[in-house]
Curated annotation (Swiss-Prot):
Protein name: 3-dehydroquinate synthase
One BP annotation, GO: aromatic amino acid family biosynthetic process
Keyword terms of this UniProt record: Amino-acid biosynthesis, Aromatic amino acid biosynthesis, Cobalt, Cytoplasm, Lyase, Metal-binding, NAD, Nucleotide-binding, Zinc
Binding site for Zn(2+): 184, 247, 264
Pathway assigned to this chain's UniProt record: Metabolic intermediate biosynthesis; chorismate biosynthesis; chorismate from D-erythrose 4-phosphate and phosphoenolpyruvate: step 2/7
Cofactor descriptive note: Binds 1 divalent metal cation per subunit. Can use either Co(2+) or Zn(2+).
C-alpha cells in the first residue's frame, strides 16, 4: 500500500493506492458508523462496483443512499448535477453528509462540484476508477461541469477529504480509456520530470499491460507530482497552470467535436503535440523532442493529429475562452525541453494556427 499526502494545512488529505481497497471499510475514512453518505456513480460502473462499495460502507454502520447517473462527458452538465442535488434533498441529507464519488473524471468533477455547492459545502471522498482520474482529476480539488460554450467553465476549487485508488478497477477499463489516461501520465514527464519521461519510454508497454509493479509506480509517481504542485499552488496562480499542457488546444477539440466524441485524453494528446510544434516554431523545443513526444503517445495508443474535419481557424474561438486568458491575451503552456515547461503569452495567432496545421492528418 502506498500513501501520499496532499499538504494543505488543515485541509491536507491522503491518497491511498493499493489493490483490494474496496473490501476494507478503513479505506473510506473519515466516514464512520452512524454517518450519512451519498454514493454517486454511473450506469456503467454501478453493476461492477456499487454493491461492493455500498456493502462495505453499510457493514461498517454508515447509512448509504445512492444516485446513478448516465455515463459520458456529455452528461457533465448542470442538468445532471441537479439530479445529485435532488437525491440529496429527497432523503434528506444534511451538512454532515459525505458524498462518495465512485467513477472517472466526469463523476469526480460533477460530484465534487455538488459537494462544494450543497448547503455551501459538504465532505466528499474521491474514488477514481479510471487511469485518467487516478493520476490527475481526483487529486487537487478542481470540480466543475461543462457549458456548451466551454469545458469546465462552471466549477469551484474544493478539496476532497481523501482519495481512494483501488488498482483492481483498471482490470475492467476498456483499452481506449486506459490510453486516454496515459495522455495525462505522459504530460507529467513532459512538463516537470525528465526522468519519469525516460522511464515511460522504457516501460509504457508494461503499463498498458497492467503489469503490477509498473502500474503501481506509474500511478504513485503521477500522484506525487500532482500533490507537490497542488501543495505549492492550490488555486493555479503559478506553476499549477503547467498541468494544463495540451489542454487549451484539447478543450477546443472536445467542445467543437461534441463532448464525448473525443475522449479527454485523446484530445489532450493531440493538443500536446500542437503545443510541442508551437514551442518548436518559437525555437524553444527541438524537432527531435517533438518526435520523441509523438512516438511515446503513439506507443500509448493515442492520436497525435487533430480531427481532419476541424480547420485550424475553428480552434481559436474556443481557445480564447480558456481560463488562462488574461486581458484578452492567449496564454499557452509550452515545453522548453523534455521535463521543463512554461506559461507563455503573446504567441501570435498565426503561429498557433500554423502549429495546429502541423497536426492535421
Amino acid at each position: 500500500m502506498e500513501r501520499i499526502t496532499v499538504t494543505l494545512g488543515e485541509r491536507s488529505y491522503p491518497i491511498t493506492i493499493a489493490a483490494g481497497l474496496f473490501d476494507d471499510s478503513a479505506s473510506f475514512m473519515p466516514l464512520k458508523a452512524g454517518e450519512q453518505a451519498m454514493l454517486v456513480t454511473n450506469q456503467t460502473l454501478a453493476p461492477l462496483y456499487l454493491d461492493r462499495v455500498r456493502g462495505v460502507l453499510e457493514n461498517s454502520g454508515v447509512h448509504v443512499d445512492q444516485v446513478i447517473l448516465p455515463d459520458g462527458e456529455q452528461y457533465k452538465s448542470l442538468t445532471v448535477l441537479d439530479q445529485v442535488f435532488s437525491a440529496l434533498l429527497a432523503k434528506p441529507h444534511g451538512r454532515d453528509t459525505t458524498i462518495v464519488a465512485l467513477g472517472g473524471g466526469v463523476i469526480g468533477d460533477l460530484a465534487g462540484f455538488a459537494a462544494a455547492s450543497y448547503q455551501r459545502g459538504v465532505r466528499f471522498i474521491q474514488v477514481p476508477t479510471t487511469l485518467l482520474s487516478q493520476v490527475d482529476s481526483s487529486v487537487g480539488g478542481k470540480t466543475a461541469v461543462n457549458h456548451p460554450l466551454g469545458k469546465n467553465m462552471i466549477g469551484a476549487f474544493y478539496q476532497p477529504v481523501s482519495v481512494v485508488i483501488d488498482l483492481d478497477c483498471l482490470k475492467s477499463l476498456p483499452a481506449r480509456e486506459l490510453s486516454s489516461g496515459l495522455a495525462e501520465v505522459i504530460k507529467y514527464g513532459i512538463i516537470l520530470d525528465r526522468d519519469f519521461f525516460l522511464w515511460l519510454e522504457e516501460n509504457i508497454e508494461a503499463v498498458r499491460e497492467l503489469q503490477p509493479d509498473a502500474l503501481a509506480y506509474c500511478i504513485r509517481r503521477c500522484c506525487e507530482i500532482k500533490a507537490a504542485v497542488v501543495a505549492a499552488d492550490e488555486r493555479e496562480s503559478g506553476m499549477r497552470a503547467l498541468l494544463n499542457l495540451g489542454h487549451t488546444y484539447g478543450h477546443a477539440i472536445e467542445a467543437e467535436m461534441g463532448y464525448g466524441n473525443w475522449l479527454h485524453g485523446e484530445a489532450v494528446a493531440a493538443g500536446m503535440v500542437m503545443a510541442a510544434h508551437t514551442a518548436r516554431r518559437l525555437g524553444q523545443f527541438s524537432a527531435e523532442d517533438v518526435e520523441r513526444v509523438k512516438s511515446l503517445l503513439v506507443r500509448a495508443g493515442l492520436p497525435v493529429n487533430g480531427p481532419t474535419q476541424m480547420a485550424p481557424e475553428a480552434y481559436l474561438p474556443h481557445m480564447m475562452r480558456d481560463k488562462k486568458v488574461l486581458a484578452g491575451e492567449l496564454r499557452l503552456v509550452l515545453p522548453t525541453a523534455i521535463g521543463q515547461s512554461e506559461v507563455r503569452g503573446g504567441v501570435a495567432h498565426d503561429m498557433v494556427l500554423a502549429s495546429i496545421a502541423d497536426c492535421l492528418a
